[in-house]
């Protein structure tokens, strides 16, 4: 199985398929369509609009209205055209390298090989949905609605982002909000009449401290990061404008709402005569909590891993993925179940060859417990 897995992986790694390369992403979708056609699955290329390549839906039960499980991975990478030729697929010293080899081509191929090698009785008994989307690396802007519609038809979901370098799976992910806060002041000459100015930068500095204090790192595990401060034009002018760019993270959506409301409340406070503040939430990604239903899925993977001869380990991740969007519709979901790797989004990306076979077999074995 390892040899054919690597052959299939090489084919898709050697295709340029950055999110903006719709043609390249669609080539990957067509490649996987061919693979699933070969094992008797019904397949459909999914048109998700002009800003994304095609997605792919595959199922062993065409016409099913509900599914026992959804498998998801994304077809796109972050890399520009030409990267596949410059850094093609390679296996060396127990590692696979090449653009997207781990994130997320390893998961794309792992799902196919797990279902290719699944027991016939499991495929006969279960309705399985495979959803490959084309734009996860740009927040699934074109595909999130489709993913959530499909997830709402499924009892549970497994997202095959790569496992951690240690081999750990992911049982929960933080939610995220991104905010732009613009502070307006009054410009004045710094030498002649500074008293007539109202410094937007000074007000923004005080506001930065107040916004940061909304976090509760030790208690709730929430974080608020003012990552960018842009203000002023030249040093001899009292600055009339300053912009804050803010990232917030939380383990559950209730805590996220509290922080969002806190930022809005601070923006309405008085930060000085002549100072006004505008706060705009640019984006929001829901949390992926480890619910009781999620824990049941975790235990299925633990059992499958043990029967494959290894102990599954789990992490709670601060970053997000499509699993967050799937969790938003109330479906229990786990992530990071594909073969393990590291160095994602860089030339240092690699996939651990020693994790390929046991991850694929684990995915196939989980079907026995559904």
Question: Can you name each region flagged by the protein language model?
Answer:
Residues 82, 92, 114-129, 211-221, ...:
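Phosphate-handling active-site elements
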């Amino acid at each position: 199985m390892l040899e054919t897995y690597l052959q299939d992986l090489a084919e898709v790694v050697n295709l340029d398929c950055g999110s903006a390369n719709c043609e390249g992403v669609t080539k990957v979708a067509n490649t996987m369509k061919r693979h699933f056609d070969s094992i008797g699955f019904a397949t459909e290329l999914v048109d998700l609009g002009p800003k994304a390549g095609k997605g792919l839906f595959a199922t062993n039960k065409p016409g099913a209205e509900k599914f026992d499980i959804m498998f998801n991975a994304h077809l796109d990478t972050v890399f520009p055209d030409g990267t596949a030729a410059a850094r093609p697929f390679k296996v060396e010293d127990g590692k696979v390298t090449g653009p997207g080899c781990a994130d997320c081509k390893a998961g794309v191929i792992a799902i196919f090989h797990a279902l290719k090698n699944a027991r016939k009785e499991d495929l006969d008994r279960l309705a399985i949905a495979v959803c490959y989307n084309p734009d996860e690396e740009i927040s699934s802007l074109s595909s999130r609605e489709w993913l959530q519609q499909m997830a709402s038809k499924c009892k549970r979901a497994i997202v095959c982002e790569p496992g951690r370098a240690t081999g750990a799976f992911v049982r929960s992910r933080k939610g995220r909000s991104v905010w732009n806060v613009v502070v307006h002041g009054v410009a004045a000459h710094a030498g002649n009449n500074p008293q007539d100015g109202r410094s937007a930068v000074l007000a923004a500095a005080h506001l930065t401290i107040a916004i940061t204090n909304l976090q509760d790192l030790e208690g709730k595990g929430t974080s608020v990061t003012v990552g960018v401060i842009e203000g002023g034009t030249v040093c001899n002018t009292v600055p009339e404008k300053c912009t804050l760019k803010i990232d917030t993270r939380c383990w559950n959506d209730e805590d996220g709402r509290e922080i969002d409301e806190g930022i809005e409340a601070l923006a309405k406070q008085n930060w000085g005569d002549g100072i006004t503040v505008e706060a705009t939430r640019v984006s929001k990604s829901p949390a992926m909590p480890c619910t009781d239903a999620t824990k049941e899925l975790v235990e299925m993977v633990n059992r499958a891993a043990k029967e494959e001869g290894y102990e599954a380990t789990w992490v709670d991740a601060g970053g997000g993925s499509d699993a967050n969007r799937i969790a938003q519709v109330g479906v229990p979901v786990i992530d990071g179940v594909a073969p393990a790797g590291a160095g994602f989004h860089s030339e240092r990306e690699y996939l651990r060859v020693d994790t390929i076979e046991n991850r694929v077999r684990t995915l196939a074995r989980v079907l026995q417990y559904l």
